[in-house]
Amino acid sequence: MITKFFLFSIVLFFTQMLSGGWYIWQRQWIEAVTQAADAVAAEELFILRAELEITNNEWQWQRISIPEKYQTSTAVLRVPAQALHNPEKLINELYHEITSLKTKKIQFDIDVPESQLKHYAQILSLLKMRLPGYELSITLLPCHLNCQESKTVIQAVDWWVLQLHGITVPTHRKEKYQLMDRTVVATALKKARTTQSQFKIALPTYAYVLSFHADGTFRRLYSEGFSGNGDTSNLELAAPDLQFIASIIRANPDIDLLWFRLPVKNDRWTLSTDTLTLLSQGITPKEKLEQHNKIEGNTLRISFRWCHQIPLHGKTATLQIPPEWREGECILLNSVALPGYIYGTIPETIQVPPARCGEEIPVAIITLRKPKS
């Protein structure tokens, strides 16, 4: 009983010590999204609720339907920067959209050019006056803190988020690219503290997939909704640096943390909640490809689990099999044996396909020819 209680206490401790909040960025709330949200419902959720689209001067909101129980969570509204050029219309659009929601907590996500920060601050101030009793927050990038006008923007809202992730898209495969620049992040955190304002930091759980043409020139960037199946030779990955993220959390224990975005079962390009639990403690998880053996009578089922990593390519793994199972018949699943493999025999090594972080992939079934005594 002591052991069980001790283990339960550890699990409870790590569950309680997860982040201060999660962004939910899915446009379709399928069952997997609801299940993921339910698992972290005790924490603060920042849910994408609507995106403003402007086409040929026509303004239209693309709204996202979410379960009733989450409609009082913080609503995130995405707005294109071009909307700032028509402040009166934008304020009216935002006012009507906000007052149609059941929450009093609103966050604006706008990729504001530095040259428009002063303009943005004026819009926020006017909107704040029209929405007494509402909690308004915004997201800012490190580049915004280089501008004096950022202080005015910050003063116009209740609090703000420093987004510490993003990527400068390369023009060629040979160029360097990363999800978080160490120098930029360190400078931004230092400047954010000098604002003497309430802010939180947003750290990435996701990876970008970059696609390149045969000549190496950049083709396309994927952040979600990409399967990654098939030929991956023209792809590269910009993944979270676990060591760097853990160091940020250790060095800034007084700053609330938000994760972007909430891992969902069908989201191939995010870290697992197991990984994020460790990171939230300032612990750097060790990447590994973990083998699991499960015996069911005369059958041995072998699977692998990608731990604490977002794999783009498959990996060669040596099968660890108990000696008494070496004489069995083998059927490969979701895996490829290396050259020289004879069907039905047990290969020494296999190629494990890439999969979602933390997901267990069946790779082989071994059956004994004679009943196991």
Model-flagged regions — what are they?
Residues 22-27, 36-40, 48-162:
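Chitinase-like catalytic core of GlcNAc-active glycosidases
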Residues 33-37, 61-65, 91-98, 121-128, ...:
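Generic structural signal for well-ordered alpha-helices
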Residues 45, 108, 160, 201, ...:
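Conserved, mostly hydrophobic/aromatic
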Residues 118-224:
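Substrate-binding surface in catalytic domains of secreted glycosidases
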Residues 202, 206-208, 214-281:
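Substrate-binding cleft of secreted/luminal carbohydrate-active enzymes
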Residues 274-296, 325:
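Low-complexity, acidic Ser/Thr/Pro/Gly-rich terminal tails and inter-domain linkers that flank the onset
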Residues 300-313, 321:
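Asparagine-centered strand-capping/turn motif at beta-strand->loop junctions
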Residues 327-364:
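Intrinsically disordered, low-complexity Pro/Gly/Ser/Thr-rich segments with frequent PxxP/GP/PP motifs
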